[in-house]
């Protein structure tokens, strides 16, 4: 089988996406080492990878050039690690909710996030998220930066968990067309 430069580029994009798993693992290690700042730095780098890998994949045409690899599944697995598992562990490990809720809230986050990830209507045709999009990494970052009270954190987690099932539109920071000029990166 002949491999051309387009196939190599497609595999390179998949490898770049896959680097998010390594960054997520490093965030996990930082959490277990009680290094909150380090864990957020690793998750921040993973977020940057996630923010540009889709654009690269579309530009390179990975679906055509590497048809046996499913970049959407790869991205979803890594997103679940970095947007759900690591933040839920942070809530538990760094005691961000009141005593007695430290196991319940991460379990709630896992459950509602599983729904988010299997919901085929999670993204609208105009690139919004329908329902809270399971960006728990951002939520936990706000808890950390604002040094919010454990009870406030608990209430926020419950509200966002409920909003997962409410058909309200949430802005996708990179792809929504109507607010594209206000978002971090422009879709090329």
Which positions does each model-derived feature cover?
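Multi-pass membrane catalytic core of lipid/isoprenoid biosynthesis enzymes
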Residues: 11-18, 59-116
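Alpha-helical transmembrane segments of multi-pass membrane proteins
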Residues: 43-50, 109-119, 157-167
């Amino acid at each position: 089988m002949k491999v051309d430069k387009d196939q190599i580029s497609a595999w390179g994009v998949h490898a770049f996406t896959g680097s998010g798993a390594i960054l997520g693992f490093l965030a996990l290690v930082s959490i277990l080492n009680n290094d909150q700042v380090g864990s957020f730095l690793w998750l921040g780098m993973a977020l940057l990878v996630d923010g540009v890998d889709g654009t690269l994949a579309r530009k390179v045409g990975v679906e055509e050039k590497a048809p046996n690899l499913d970049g959407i599944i790869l991205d979803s697995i890594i997103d679940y690690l970095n947007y759900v598992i690591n933040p839920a562990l942070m809530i538990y490990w760094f005691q961000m909710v009141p005593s007695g809720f430290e196991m319940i809230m991460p379990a709630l986050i896992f459950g509602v996030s599983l729904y988010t990830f299997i919901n085929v209507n999670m993204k609208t045709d105009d690139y919004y998220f329908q329902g809270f999009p399971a960006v728990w990494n951002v939520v936990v970052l706000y808890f950390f930066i604002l040094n919010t009270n454990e009870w406030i954190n608990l209430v926020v987690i419950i509200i966002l968990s409920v909003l997962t099932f409410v058909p309200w539109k949430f802005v996708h920071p990179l792809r929504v067309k109507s607010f594209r000029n206000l978002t971090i990166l422009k879709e090329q």
